[in-house]
Regions:
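Helix-to-loop junction immediately C-terminal to a conserved catalytic motif
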Residues: 66
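Conserved ABC transporter NBD signature motif
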Residues: 74-85, 90-91
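Pre-NBD coupling/linker segments of ABC/ABC-like ATPases
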Residues: 2-34
């Protein structure tokens, strides 16, 4: 990422009923800077964590790196791709886990979501079994693979979300 920035146009709300009506027909916008001139390099295989207060731009930056948001300024290259072009070769090699988003089907056992990911990503049976076994052992969730996701504790669900995000061995 080089001088990565994201600026949103946010509607300014006017008080009262008359203000709400005016906002409906003639909204007023102000600029909200979410990310300002962020630059960094992450080498392949390097683990990185984003920490900071609410509103610091962590999620916005991750969304730009994954191609979910187009930056207002700067440039990004992730494994040799422009993320917002959403190329298949790029998408099959990344993963993003966010606390509010679920990859697991709520009404099915976690293993069914993993099996679906296997088919979506075209993972061979042998590679899938090896990766699944490694992740399940590392995260110690073997005893809950066949439990309906809605019945898992938050910790168990987060571990299962990690398995779903990593099952295709993203770069």
């Amino acid at each position: 990422a080089d001088n990565l920035s994201k600026v949103y146009d946010v509607q300014k709300k006017r008080p009262g009923l008359s203000g709400s009506l005016r906002d409906l027909y003639s909204p007023v916008y102000e600029k909200k800077v979410a990310v300002k001139d962020v630059s960094f390099v992450i080498d392949e295989g390097e683990l990185v964590g984003f920490i900071g207060p609410n509103g610091a731009g962590k999620t916005t930056t991750l969304k730009m790196l994954s191609g979910l948001l187009y930056p207002s300024g700067g440039s990004v290259s992730v494994i040799g791709h422009d993320p917002w072009k959403r190329e298949y070769d790029f998408l099959k090699n990344i993963s993003l886990v966010m606390g509010q988003k679920n990859q697991l089907w709520w009404d099915l056992p976690a293993i069914e979501s993993f099996n679906l990911a296997k088919d979506i990503y075209g993972i061979s049976d042998s590679s899938y079994k090896k990766t699944l076994n490694n992740l399940v052992e590392m995260l110690e969730i073997g005893d809950v693979l066949n439990v309906q996701v809605r019945k898992l504790s938050l910790g168990q669900r987060m571990k299962a979300e990690l398995v779903a995000a990593l099952i295709h061995s993203p770069k």
